[in-house]
Structure formats: structure tokens, C-alpha cells
Amino acid sequence: MTSRAKSLFIFFFLISCTFMLLETDASRNKLSSYIPLCGSNTYCGGLWCPKKGGKYSCISMSCDIQEDCPKLVRCKNSPGPYCMEGFCTC
């Protein structure tokens, strides 16, 4: 009787662990369409990004290393993004 309960516990534990791993991987692998397409503006010291309703605003995204920025933002008509002085820029 104990071995049957133990087997069921292990089975459901493995199922729940598998589900959690799949959910975690799915949330990390976002498509590039979810990453905003930003640019630069002479009046903006940060990134010039679209918001809801088609309006643009100046935002700042902080970064620690060069690899952080491509996960946060895409650049329109320029190379990059890259990390400069702790902020992502295009």
C-alpha cells in the first residue's frame, strides 16, 4: 500500500516539475515582436519608443552587460542596441 502511494506521489511530482519547466522556458523565449522597436531622437537622451496609441515617448532601459540590451529593445535604422554607461541605446 505504501509503495503505491509513493509511486503516485513520484508520478505527480514529475508531471508538475515538467509542467513548470515548460512554462518557464516558454516565458523566456519570447518572439522578437514582443520586443519594442525603438530609435533615437535629438531631444531624447534615452530610447525613442512607441507606446499604446501610436505615440512615442523617451524611455531609459538600464543594462549591466552588452548582452542585456538585445533582450529588451530592438533598434530601427541603426546598429545595436548596445549598453553605454549603464543604459541601452541605439
Swiss-Prot record:
Disulfide bonds join 63-83, 69-88, 75-90. One of its GO terms (cellular component) is extracellular region. It comes from the Eukaryota. Residues 1-26 form the signal peptide. The keyword Magnesium does not apply. Keywords: Antimicrobial, Disulfide bond, Fungicide, Plant defense, Secreted, Signal. GO terms for biological process: defense response to fungus; killing of cells of another organism. It is found in: Secreted. Belongs to the DEFL family. This is Defensin-like protein 293.
